[in-house]
Design a protein with these regions (language model features):
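C-terminal ends of transmembrane helices
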Residues: 2-5, 74-89, 137-148, 191-202, ...
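Predominantly late transmembrane helices and immediately cytosolic-facing juxtamembrane segments
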Residues: 4, 9-10, 205-208, 214, ...
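Hydrophobic core segments of alpha-helical transmembrane domains in multi-pass membrane transport
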Residues: 17-30, 71-77, 107-109, 189-194, ...
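Transmembrane alpha-helix boundary signature
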Residues: 28-40, 54-58, 74-89, 107-126
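Hydrophobic transmembrane alpha-helices of secondary-active transporters
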Residues: 51, 56, 61-85, 236, ...
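Structural signature of hydrophobic alpha-helical transmembrane segments
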Residues: 61-72, 120-134, 175-188, 227, ...
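Entry/N-cap segments of selected transmembrane alpha helices
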Residues: 82-109, 179-188, 322-344, 374, ...
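Functional cores that coordinate and move charged inorganic groups
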Residues: 140-247, 252-253, 257
């Protein structure tokens, strides 16, 4: 198990697993089992209540609205942590990557709209706005020390803001007809979670029952995408621990002294007194970690190595068997997505960064050259999972969805290769 743990502990591992999952989906979609592959994810699964189906959705729907809700829950936890004490805590230190992220979302959307304005394909404008943080950071960490630490922080902060932007786009622009009664119940459950947080409730069971059985289900029934419920629920999770740092340190020092005073035996097992002390240390350590960070720590590897690969396998498969070049480019969807990601992302990020530096609103991070900035802009054009997710919300027509996926693949592959080549070359600081 040690090699597996070491692999999962590496920053680049998530990107590698995701890439393999995308490759597997492409293979499955273009072999003689393609029909079974597509049919499998269309099978229904749900509940029967009083003889009536309840939440009776396809496996594809469950993955996109259920499993991906866990992904967005972790995104919400990360956003809250960053707002409280992370990269987004001090707006002055993050003004440049925040501005770059906004530019990197606006320009791709404008390019797409410029090519598709006035057509039914307009709804796909949100597809080229998103960056796949797992892939982008995976490439950066593959390069190791060739990318300065300041550049990694810049890209991470940019990706965090990009995630927040994607969440807001989904909430406001990719929501179907609303059931206000269900939505009202959803916000009522959120209010109870908020009140529980303010009252100092730190029980995982309390937030799990209200978050899943209350907020997620009601938002799913309301018409608002259930992933938004996950982000909102994450913001209700307590960020403070049951005991503060000073109390924890006092307890640990006291318990350590007790442990030292216990009579040690000459065998490999511990004395009962020592076991009791270590049990208390284990308990105090667990309650010294905020529930927010406990959940983030436990769920992050599940999201990276289980949920994201499943999502990729279910959504990344494109069958090229009966797909011609004329089919792909019969509309401007593929072109809009490709140019939006491949050109729009770098232009938006680099242009906004240069403008803010010229206006002296911010300064370029130390040790970050112009070539590094361009390389990071290219890596931001890797859309993959987030772009594919938005494409499933934007298009119901299979051909348009396929065109969007082709555009995402083209831009992500070219952007990833281009960014890697640029960042792999040592440069002098600008």
């Amino acid at each position: 198990m040690l090699p597996i743990k070491l692999f999962m502990g590496r920053e680049k591992s998530g990107g590698i697993v995701l890439l393999l999952s995308v490759a597997l989906a492409m293979v499955l979609a273009n072999t003689n089992i393609a029909t079974s592959y597509f049919h499998f994810f269309e099978q229904k699964a749900g509940f029967i209540i009083n003889g009536q189906p309840f939440l009776d959705y396809s496996l594809h729907h469950w993955i996109n609205d259920g499993l991906m809700a866990i992904f967005f829950f972790v995104v919400g936890l990360e956003l809250k942590r960053e707002f409280i004490g992370g990269e987004l805590a001090d707006i002055r230190n993050t003004l440049l990557p925040i501005g770059a992220a906004i530019g990197g979302m606006v320009v791709p959307a404008l390019i797409y709209l410029g090519l598709n304005f006035g057509s039914p394909q307009t709804m796909g404008w949100g597809v080229p706005m998103a960056t796949d943080i797992a892939f982008a950071l995976g490439v950066v960490y593959l390069l190791g020390d060739k990318v300065p630490a300041s550049a990694k922080v810049f890209l991470t902060t940019l990706a965090i803001v990009d995630d927040l932007g994607a969440v807001l786009v989904i909430a406001f622009f990719y929501t179907s007809e609303l059931s206000f009664v269900s939505l009202l119940f959803g916000f009522a459950f959120l209010a109870v979670m908020f009140i529980g947080n303010r009252l100092g409730i730190k029980s995982l069971l309390f937030y799990a029952v209200l978050g899943i059985g209350g907020v997620w289900v009601t938002f799913l029934l309301s018409g608002i995408h259930a992933t938004i419920a996950a982000v909102l629920a994450a913001f209700m999770i307590p960020a403070d621990a049951k005991i503060n740092e000073s109390i924890y340190l006092k307890r640990i020092k006291k318990l350590t002294r007790r442990f030292e005073q216990e009579d040690a035996n000459e065998v490999i097992t511990l004395e009962e007194g020592q076991v009791d002390v270590l049990t208390h240390i284990q308990h105090d350590t667990s309650i010294a970690i905020p529930l927010l960070q406990q959940l983030e720590h436990k769920l992050a590897p599940i999201v990276t190595f289980v949920i994201m690969p499943i999502f990729a396998i279910a959504n990344a498969g494109i069958s090229f068997t009966n797909l011609s070049i004329s089919d792909v480019f019969s509309t401007h969807v593929a072109l809009g997505v490709t140019l939006g990601l491949l050109l729009g992302k770098p232009i938006g990020i680099i242009g906004t960064t240069v403008l803010m530096v010229k206006l002296r609103w911010a300064s370029l991070p130390s040790a970050m050259s112009r070539r590094t900035l361009i390389g990071l802009g290219m890596l931001a054009s890797i859309g993959f999972t987030m772009s594919m997710f938005i494409s499933t919300l934007a298009f119901t027509d299979e051909l348009l969805l396929t065109q969007a996926k082709v555009g995402i693949f083209l831009a992500s592959i070219l952007g990833g290769i281009g960014g890697y080549i640029l960042l792999n070359q040592p440069t002098k600081k600008a």
